[in-house]
UniProtKB/Swiss-Prot annotation:
This is Lipoyl synthase, mitochondrial. Binds 2 [4Fe-4S] clusters per subunit. One cluster is coordinated with 3 cysteines and an exchangeable S-adenosyl-L-methionine. Its EC number is 2.8.1.8. It catalyses: [[Fe-S] cluster scaffold protein carrying a second [4Fe-4S](2+) cluster] + N(6)-octanoyl-L-lysyl-[protein] + 2 oxidized [2Fe-2S]-[ferredoxin] + 2 S-adenosyl-L-methionine + 4 H(+) = [[Fe-S] cluster scaffold protein] + N(6)-[(R)-dihydrolipoyl]-L-lysyl-[protein] + 4 Fe(3+) + 2 hydrogen sulfide + 2 5'-deoxyadenosine + 2 L-methionine + 2 reduced [2Fe-2S]-[ferredoxin]. GO terms for molecular function: 4 iron, 4 sulfur cluster binding; lipoate synthase activity; metal ion binding.
Amino acid sequence: MAASSTRLRCLYASSAPAWKKSPSQSIISLSRHYATTSSTTPSLNPDESSSSSSSTIPKRRKTTTFRDKLNAGPSFADFVTGGNGNNASLDPEEAYALEKVMIPGPAGRKKEHTRLPSWLKTPIPDSTNYKRIKKDLRGLDLHTVCEEARCPNISDCWGGSDKSAATATIMLMGDTCTRGCRFCSVKTLRTPGPLDPHEPENTAEALSRWGLGDDLPDGGAHHFAETVIKIKQKAPGILVECLTGDFAGDLDMVSLVAKSGLDVYAHNVETVEALTPHVRDRRATFKQSLRVLEAAKRAKPSLITKTSMMLGFGETEDQLWDALRQLRASNVDVVTFGQYMRPTKRHMAVHEYVTPDKFELWRQRALEMGFLYVASGPLVRSSYKAGEAFIENVLKKRRGVGNTPGAEVASAKDVPVDVLGK
């Protein structure tokens, strides 16, 4: 009976008029009213409160500076048309100017940063062939200049399927260099660790698996010779190019490598003579590099000699002309031009991003001077798209029609046993 009376009192209270409601109900209504975000003055009358709240329109949120900038910014049509209202493209000078941005910082410490032009951007490597080569390199404990020097063409070279694109640059004698050039990202150490005695065999094994045209940058002539011999024994048809250092001016070591059975002897002068002291290691000179290329040609006249130069250090046209004349006088057959790209902030800054048109101009000039082949472009590197098919045809003509590129294969007895054992 008590429960029934309680329920009846609740029903009576809910249906009673406002003036008969208890003071406690008015207080509850008032507290609920204050809990809302309405800016109107709260009323003690529940009916008045509900009617006023239902008719209240919420205030519009205050606009912000960011929203104003966003609304005043470019529309989707501006992005499609390039922001100039039409489909006209920018010339290289205008595009280059837009790539320069100012990095914020404290007063007096702001820096101007130049972003990479569009013609220097390459895809991220992710092909099946790329992964296969990388897996083999790790399994055989081999190193490549492609990775150590952060080459932008690694996706194209390792991921290619045809002979001209499938190129890997094996780096002999470990992944560390004893010199410290200001443009190179390869690790440097005054006294690297001992040589891996299995490296020549592993290199030959890797090349026989891949069937690539390979370059072998290294600083040890004896290690070079043994590696070339083993490669030619396992795969005589592979076009072998050795990119060597200057052997500290020891031309006997240059001759040893030149006679080991390789097809192309490459040694890079890197830049013009005037900038060499500022760009390369202090132990390297332009004249010494010329002597290396000349010695290789004397040791084996049918050998193709090759060098590479980077543009963008601040070289002048007169300096480039002078460098090409000296290279041609040294009987160099092939020259390549590429854009210098700064590996890290610790290395030399880029003075200029040379346009593709200018690279093409220097290609034509070099060909007119009598070079057999010239590869010139922003992404060209010493071993990238350097005319393997063209060079192979030249070698066939020099050795006689019908001979394969590996016809002149050296044997172990051609190199002194005591030299190979060192």
